[in-house]
Design a protein with these regions (language model features):
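Feature captures hydrophobic
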Residues: 1-103
Length: 103
């Protein structure tokens, strides 16, 4: 499903003043990665390859499901090794601030 997760991320997006970042989620079993760009109050999200990424994250669909269902944070997924990431870790930590799925 090409729309998986997109509406959920949109619904939970909390704009961050003066914050810009580009994320690429490689979700196991999906042909295309999930690209997410935050530009202050604007969120761009779609499936497809993009350049100039700040944080690459790799995870299984079950882990992404746990995150968007509010059972786990991005930070916890990373700390437990259920999500691997490379790039700017300060930008990685912002994910839980911008997308509070746990409330």
């Amino acid at each position: 499903d090409e729309e998986a997760y997109i509406e959920t991320f949109r619904a939970q997006f909390a704009p961050q003043p003066e914050f810009r970042a580009r994320y690429l989620f490689i979700i196991e079993g999906r042909k295309k990665p999930l690209f997410l760009e935050v530009n202050e109050g604007e969120l761009t999200i779609h499936y497809g390859q993009e350049e100039n990424i700040d944080v690459y994250a790799k995870l299984k669909p079950e882990v992404m499901d746990s995150i968007v269902d509010g059972r786990m944070t991005f930070q916890r997924a990373f700390m437990t090794g259920e999500m691997t990431a490379k790039g700017n870790f300060k930008i990685l930590r912002m994910l839980d601030t911008m997308f509070n799925f746990a409330h």
